[in-house]
Amino acid sequence: TLDKFVKNNNGGYKHLSLNYVEDYSNFANLTYPQFFTNDDGDVFMYMREGGASNGAYKFSKYDATTSSWSNFTHFNVRNAGNQSVITYNWGLYGNMKYVNGKSRIGFQRRSSNQNDKYRYQNGVYYAYSDDQSGASGWKNHSGESFSLPLYDADFVKVMEPGDYVQTTQSNQVHIVGDFD
């Protein structure tokens, strides 16, 4: 309920901090906060940073003994297209949660490529970590390891349902509904 939230100095609920120190560079572009717990009862929060075709997930763990949140761990990065092997920036739409002893993330990718056949996002992507904190031990669906942050979404790609559609015209394939 709303009475559990702390108002900011303007009487609203937008905060640029998790630990009482305003940090504009880390909090200004965050949206869609989600919370989950692991088997140890630790509380995690993840958010999307950035926009549709250039967004990233980052997450933080709450430490009850110090009443503070950890620094953000970046699952992926914004501006991935700046990497030499990545052609386009991309954002992700999906969910991060802890299920059956693993931190897991499933998503669809939305590329900044405006000339591909997809309208909005495409693909099925999945990764998991055996580390309850999610800080290390990430693997794709085939069990191949990778380090965070993830730059190349194709490394965690499970499948592309859009491949079953025979077209190369832009914005013709729509596979978004009810994904998450």
Give a label for each model feature:
Residues 1-180:
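Extracellular, repeat-based ectodomains that mediate carbohydrate processing or recognition
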